[in-house]
Amino acid sequence: MHERYVPADVEAAAQSDWRAADAYRSKEDANRKKFYCVSMLPYPSGKLHMGHVRNYTINDVMYRYLRMNGYNTLMPMGWDAFGMPAENAAMANGVPPAQWTYDNIAYMKKQMQSMGLAIDWSREVTTCKPDYYKWNQWLFLKMLEKGIAYKKTGTVNWDPVDQTVLANEQVIDGRGWRSGALVEKREIPMYYMRITQYADELLNDLDGLGWPERVKIMQQNWIGKSFGVNFGFPYELDGEKKLLRVFTTRADTIMGVTFCAIAAEHPLAARLAQDKPELQAFIDECKRGGVAEADIATMEKKGVATGFSVSHPLTGAPVEVWIGNYVLMSYGEGAVMGVPAHDERDFAFAKKYGLPIRQVIAVEGETYSTDAWQEWYGDKTRAVCVNSGKYDGLAYDAAVDAIAADLKAGGFGDKQITYRLRDWGISRQRYWGTPIPIIHCPSCGDVPVPEQDLPVVLPEDLVPDGTGNPLAKSDAFLNCACPKCGAAAKRETDTMDTFVDSAWYFSRYAAPDAQTMVDARTDYWMPMDQYIGGIEHAILHLLYSRFWAKVMRDLGLVAFGEPAKNLLTQGMVLNETFYREDAAGKKTWYNPADVTVSFDDKGRPVGAVLKADGQPVVLGGIEKMSKSKNNGVDPQMLIDHYGADTARLFTMFAAPPEQQLEWSGAGVDGASRFLRRVWAFGFANREALAVRAPFDVAQLAEADKTLRREIHGVLKQADFDYQRLQYNTVVSAAMKMLNAIEGAKGATPAVLRETYGVLLRVLYPVVPHVTYELWKALGYADEFGPLLDAPWPKVDEAALEQAEIELVLQINGKVRGALKVAKDASREAIEAAAVADEMFAKFAEGKPAKKIIVVPGRLVNVVV
């Protein structure tokens, strides 16, 4: 054992032992409790960031603690390796996405290994490899057979210059990110999955999950179950009688309809524009907008009158039809009823275009005015119908019932439950993704690739150039024979949404070498006992993975319908930001490592200068670490300088896992100093700590009893904190233990050995390298076995017993001191001790005690 703690040497030695023993390979064991904990697999972007370090350390701590407690634990890792960033990098660097991806994986894997994570690398999954995505294709075909997957036209962003489809994030101010061309909306055939078929189950099953409440609420809102009325406004066109259908949750306001708005893609819009160039021009303008719901919500609401009217289903009055850029064809019926008096968006639209505003609900004590929108205009809890004929005086529920009944009687509509959730469109007009296993034959149409021909392998040598999908230009990939008739045919060039890849990887970890999609091992490990990832995945990834599990269950592949029992959403890692702004308002951001900060006497930053030139920079405040703000900390530099254990210790100590973590260089230094103290104590006392002598608890001296009482008391709290995932207070507990052990005067070697051994085990899940090496060097491994599987220390309740307790002493309600009494002292004895105490004599000023109040175990108050 070396005198000085050298993290690089300590960590290399520990990791060498773990590799030699294949220490983290997990096997199924039906006789043991299992614990399967998974961090959301990373995208191989090139380097780990501190968010990764925090996530994986949380997982690792959980794994090690539970393994010491007898669980059969598994912590796997993989790579979410398909996706657009690889294509962008390929275009920038002129290399195939595969090369960029595999190089990044190799580097990031090396970084993870340097962190000492308890990963079972034999289960590694890479989603861009054919042995993985084969099963995406296989399940897609099964879903196609069952009608869960299907084909229909969908709206996409089309770049007319690059001749390619753009993701929503590639549309900037209505233009293509590369070409700058005005983006168009296009309808193209795409594949969808019927997630809506599972809407109620996805909603109801949230109740049984140990997930954060805000994640559940986000999913509930995304699924968006609504109770309303679906009905139509009758009209006649080209000699045909039809209904313009809408869905509303506010049927009670139907008498206030003054217009209807339809989407630019609505069939009625196309028909009405046939002989009206101004309508067609507006439709074309709408098609150049984004297709994302978020874009629609924030853009200016525009409309154009068609000059065509439909009839109100209950009054027969004409209702003018408008085309609105805010109406999405993909949501509801592609048409909405306009009730300006009681819908804020309709109110603004009506004011802009001078449309009638008709009040049809009222709230007692409130006065309606069309001058400005007020919150109560949309109230349905206190409102009653007015100006609504036979429905006047009815509250919301009664009005909806009566109006729905009348609409049904007239053949116009009825009550309906609807969902905000839409079927999952999985087609992506991109190269770097799972090929959709469909062949297009001129004679047979769309033909599924036969199961024996799977996987359809994605060529890895193509380099995208931004002008269309490279697969469509690759004859070797594109051209094939029809499996049905043998004629010349072409492969589907769309690939699958990368959310497909991440929808089930945790099931494949359980059986990575299976010749089927999953096998019995999957039902042993799944569902995950703990899933860990960022709140940004609360909706799409987590919702799709829940849907995928239910589909796999219904196809008889697995026994579970939910992939994760518990979810932890770790907080973001924050850091200071610094910048300079030029005359044009452009900001240049500087990394905190390149800046010298000055602080006031309370430690608050008050100024900063750039190290390179000594000139001031602006303090931009604390924000999430990001490339855009250049405020990240390179984990590799941290590990190289301080060691992985220091990085792990700081990230666990700085904040509870679910809360934001503010980066602190001083905090990292403090973590490093603490580990040096742990090592230094072990080295300085190595001979005493090597003594393995039994001791009789009853015969221990007071110094030993005091130390054991403190250590076992802190151990009890630390164990509780491990169970509730409060790792920051676990580290606090370890610090208290070290303080107690260092300050123990007169403790015997045997008790020092016991208590230091407790400290090493409490710290081990957080800082495994230094504790593992100390455990081995000081002979604990000879007694208990390697620290990896050493039993978790048990709290000695007898050690917590005290002969004396300390009570707060108050005189006339003011704290004046402390009173030591026997643990089982009677009330009379406590009262006598209180009046005999020197503090009573000092503050009573010769007055006798009138009354003595004793709160058992806490305080005694003498009233004079």
From Swiss-Prot:
Catalytic activity: tRNA(Leu) + L-leucine + ATP = L-leucyl-tRNA(Leu) + AMP + diphosphate
A cellular component term, taken from the record's GO annotations: cytosol
Domain of life, per lineage: Bacteria
Enzyme class: ligase
Positions with a binding annotation for ATP: 627
Main location: cytoplasm
E.C. numbers: 6.1.1.4
Keywords attached to this entry: Aminoacyl-tRNA synthetase, ATP-binding, Cytoplasm, Ligase, Nucleotide-binding, Protein biosynthesis
Extent of motif 'HIGH' region: 42-52
InterPro entries in the record: aa-tRNA-synth_I_CS, aa-tRNA-synth_Ia, Leu-tRNA-ligase, Leu_tRNA-synth_edit, M/V/L/I-tRNA-synth_anticd-bd, Methionyl/Leucyl_tRNA_Synth, Rossmann-like_a/b/a_fold, tRNAsynth_Ia_anticodon-bd
Subcellular location: Cytoplasm
Pfam family, one: tRNA-synt_1
Biological processes, Gene Ontology terms: leucyl-tRNA aminoacylation
Family the entry assigns: Belongs to the class-I aminoacyl-tRNA synthetase family.
NCBIfam families registered for this protein in UniProt: leuS_bact
Entry protein name: Leucine--tRNA ligase
Species, as recorded: Burkholderia thailandensis (strain ATCC 700388 / DSM 13276 / CCUG 48851 / CIP 106301 / E264)
